[in-house]
């Protein structure tokens, strides 16, 4: 939990905030004590790649700092396309109950991962690209979007993706306008807004979807097909979604940053994409707002954390919760909140966890045989 000091206008501390903080800490004590004792690490088959070097706005390149005014204080909300797409992808994985862990350029151990998602990582080093190639060559699945790997960290570029051989597509040097659509047989048309996306041609990848653009420039005041929107018009034939086999693995390339949009149609597209290419989803009857995290301690203990994370407090309790977790035969299960044992129920190589009621949070310690 994170609290900022609560100070009244007269300079005194707001005692009710600290009373609330104390109640939260006391309620979390069984869980924090278990984590301190076990010191587990995230258990996941999916990796989400975050490129700090790519968190830039190329449109501001060359603008003197004295002229750069974002119009916001240090407490304001800023927009960063890459961070927005990574966080939206993380939300989608959480909604789908797909455990994941964050990867960066400093993460050398990719063991245990079956799929890695790279969101619009424009600036990648040769070492990062080599690690991604090796991952796919050895049987992994890479999902890359947008401008990923177009330039090295110093900005140098050949004009094509560094990972063009892995993607199976080539960058044409051209971009869409700020509105474009992905056209696929399954989803029809899915919009990407407020971003110019690269136009690419298939080299030797399988074409899963193409790029459709409006008939006229976005938001043109004189030429338009609709006065209040930019509807799809021309199917360009450029590759929008592709699948490329590489070594023993495969690479999915998505031309746009539509995963950053948190609207229903874009989320539905992302869910279909991840269900097809990202393994490790847990079966449960939990709503999208609930989170499930898997952790593994050094002694082999599996820790399952379930959080009822509704947007508007207080949480509405969830009843008759069921979760299925693929795992080896289990010796015992203990509920962390009260330390009581839980009956072990296995079915088809999966552990079945049941909760009669989930208010806010619960954890389980699972000892495997």
Language-model features: where?
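Carbohydrate-binding surfaces of carbohydrate-active enzymes
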Residues: 1-369
